[in-house]
Design a protein with these regions (language model features):
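Domain-level signature for soluble enzymes in the chorismate/prephenate branch of the shikimate pathway
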Residues: 1-117
Length: 117
C-alpha cells in the first residue's frame, strides 16, 4: 500500500515528457538518426535471411549423413561467444540470449523443413 507521503514523492518524481519537439534542428537530427536505424534494420533482415539460407544448406548436409539437427556443443559455443561479443558492445546478456534463442529456433525450423522433405 502506498502512503500519502510516498504518493506525493511519486508525483514529484514523475516527469511528463512531450511526444516530440517543434525545433527544426532537433527534428532534422532525429530524422537523420532514424534513417540510420532504418538502414541498419534493413541490413539486419538481409543478414538474417542469408543466415537462414546457410542453415538450410547445413540442414541438407545433415540430411545426407543422417545427423541430428540440434548440435548442443555447437549451440553452447555460439551462445558463449555471442554473449561475450555482446557484452563488449554494451549489450545485456539477457538481450543477447533472447535474440540468439530466436535465431536458433528459426534455424532449426528451416533445417526441419529440409530434413522432413
Amino acid at each position: 500500500q502506498v502512503t500519502p507521503a510516498a504518493l506525493k514523492q511519486i508525483f514529484i518524481d514523475l516527469k511528463m515528457r512531450k511526444e516530440t519537439d517543434e525545433n527544426a534542428e532537433w527534428n532534422k537530427e532525429m530524422a537523420l538518426q532514424r534513417a540510420y536505424i532504418d538502414e541498419l534494420d534493413t541490413k539486419l533482415i538481409e543478414i538474417l535471411g542469408k543466415r537462414m539460407k546457410l542453415a538450410e544448406k547445413i540442414g541438407q548436409l545433415k540430411k545426407e549423413k543422417n545427423v541430428a539437427i540440434l548440435q548442443n556443443k555447437r549451440w553452447n559455443e555460439i551462445l558463449g561467444r555471442m554473449i561475450l561479443d555482446g557484452e563488449e558492445k554494451g549489450l545485456n546478456e539477457e538481450f543477447v540470449l533472447k535474440i540468439y534463442k530466436a535465431i536458433h529456433q528459426e534455424s532449426i525450423t528451416h533445417q526441419e523443413k529440409i530434413i522432413n522433405k
